[in-house]
């Protein structure tokens, strides 16, 4: 049974806004960041990481876990994952959960469906 918690984009933002110990990991592709925009990392205190899980061709980044681990994030840190609509972010959270990370959150409505239409800060 997974312990990953689903959270809306609005609830995610209100949680990370003043939490410098949390992390928001955007697992979309560079194309998506350029085309649809990015979260405005200057609008909240949490650490922001862009780390692609699946590339434009649909291939999974086999180095995702190693690249994530290179940030030195503690396994009990609050980590929020966001993608376009919530599927890839859940996949990323499941990868980390299976490697001992504990406080994982999936932004279930994603950036395009949740974050941006809600008027949350983006660039």
At which residue positions do the language-model features occur?
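Rhodanese-like catalytic fold shared by cysteine-dependent sulfurtransferases
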Residues: 2-23, 30-78, 87-123
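Short, surface-exposed ligand- or partner-binding patches at beta-edge/loop junctions that are enriched
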Residues: 81-82
């Amino acid at each position: 049974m997974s312990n990953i918690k689903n959270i809306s984009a609005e609830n995610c933002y209100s949680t990370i806004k003043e939490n410098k110990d949390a992390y928001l990991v955007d697992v979309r592709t560079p194309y998506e960041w350029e085309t649809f925009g990015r979260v405005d990392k200057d609008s909240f205190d949490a650490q922001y990481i862009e780390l692609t899980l699946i590339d434009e061709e649909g291939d999974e980044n086999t180095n995702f876990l190693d690249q994530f681990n290179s940030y030195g994030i503690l396994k009990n840190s609050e980590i929020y994952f966001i993608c376009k609509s919530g599927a890839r972010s859940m996949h990323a959270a499941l990868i980390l959960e299976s490697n001992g990370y504990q406080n994982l959150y999936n932004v279930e409505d994603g950036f395009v469906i949740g974050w941006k239409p809600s008027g949350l800060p983006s660039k």
